[in-house]
Amino acid sequence: MTHIPAAPAAVDYLLLTPGPLSTTATVRAAMLQDSCTWDADYNQGVVEPIRRELVRLAAGPEYQSDYSAVLLQGSGSYVVESVLGSAIGVDECLLIINNGAYGARMGEMARCLGLRHHELDCGETTRPEAAAIEAMLVRHPEITHLAMVHCETTTGMLNPLEEVAALCQRRGIRLIVDAMSSFGGIPIDMGRLGIEFLISSANKCIQGVPGFGFVIARRAALAACAGCARSVSLDLHAQWQTMEQQGGKWRFTSPTHTVLAFAQALRELDEEGGIAARHRRYRDNQRTLVDGMAALGFAPLLPEQWQSPIITAFYSPAHPDYRFADFYQRLKAQGFVIYPGKVSQADCFRIGNIGDVTPARVRCLLVAMASACYWQGDAR
């Protein structure tokens, strides 16, 4: 007899998180079929169109022939580690911009991989400044690559990609962008910005489900990764070559159901009006959220000019009876799931604005939020 408990009863929670996030019924339904990992109907009929569409979304028409997309099993962090471990040669040096948990994670990866690198630690609630980055580049002329998180979901900060990209282009530095929580929800033109590698994940702004991440990169940069990998399964060049030469085939077992869901999510992104339209919806969600939370007495962690439309951190109430776990459970009982804080310097919690979320659903959250504030005398 099995000792695995029965699955909990299905509840249609609204996940107000940075991913995994709430998906549409049609994205989930796309997973209700099985695929053979070596069959042409799957690889050439599903994987290859995904690769082409990712390049189309990432670069303007005049740049698209310069770029290619590589899909890789695992979470987004697996793909970040694949890029760092494959793209930085033994005689090259990486500068990591660290202003949150995900910049710090890249530093941890670099140390584990034995990469020559430097870190610019800006603090969790400070935006990186191009002048400070340039000073670091002047001080360390051995730096060849720069890696930065675009949307640092530790705080919800949108880092200054345009300014940093312009600096890298001017100084001949190869730019690696962790766009995990921004690609698909914020317009980015890799060609215009001169980005070498852009990394994201299926379960973020494209609104798919977890299971793989992807890299969009210059073909020349991918070719230069040959022989550099510090890992077999995370060898970016080998994965790219297999997909290029065998019509979308993955080297190792492909997460077929996740890929089918992602293909449907890409279709739904197009139906919504593309990245610009999705960006407007996310921005409207975030504005509705911040205005409504202010009316309830909650203040955002970041100034408005630094805030992304992806996720927002709010200071926790100073009331002695407030406990995040109790607050969370009261919201969950009403069908809403939020995120705990990740900032070491402030007591806060986070609410995501992405996924199958609209301003109307945010307003429903705000009603639930008012009744979940149990430390206020009239909360029910």
Curated annotation (Swiss-Prot):
Cofactor: pyridoxal 5'-phosphate
Subunit structure: Homodimer.
Keyword match Isomerase: no
Function: Involved in phosphonate degradation.
Family: Belongs to the class-V pyridoxal-phosphate-dependent aminotransferase family. PhnW subfamily.
The protein's name in its UniProt record: 2-aminoethylphosphonate--pyruvate transaminase
InterPro entries: Aminotrans_V_dom, NH2EtPonate_pyrv_transaminase, PyrdxlP-dep_Trfase, PyrdxlP-dep_Trfase_major, PyrdxlP-dep_Trfase_small, SP_NH2Trfase/AEP_transaminase
SUPFAM superfamilies: PLP-dependent transferases
One Pfam family linked to the record: Aminotran_5
MF GO annotations: 2-aminoethylphosphonate-pyruvate transaminase activity
Catalysed reactions, as listed in the record: (2-aminoethyl)phosphonate + pyruvate = phosphonoacetaldehyde + L-alanine
PANTHER family (UniProt xref): 2-AMINOETHYLPHOSPHONATE--PYRUVATE TRANSAMINASE
Source organism per UniProt: Aeromonas hydrophila subsp. hydrophila (strain ATCC 7966 / DSM 30187 / BCRC 13018 / CCUG 14551 / JCM 1027 / KCTC 2358 / NCIMB 9240 / NCTC 8049)
Domain of life: Bacteria
Keywords: Aminotransferase, Pyridoxal phosphate, Pyruvate, Transferase
Enzyme Commission number(s) from the entry: 2.6.1.37
GO biological process: organic phosphonate catabolic process
UniProt modified residues of type N6-(pyridoxal phosphate)lysine: 204
Keyword Transferase set for record: yes
Species lineage: Bacteria, Pseudomonadati, Pseudomonadota, Gammaproteobacteria, Aeromonadales
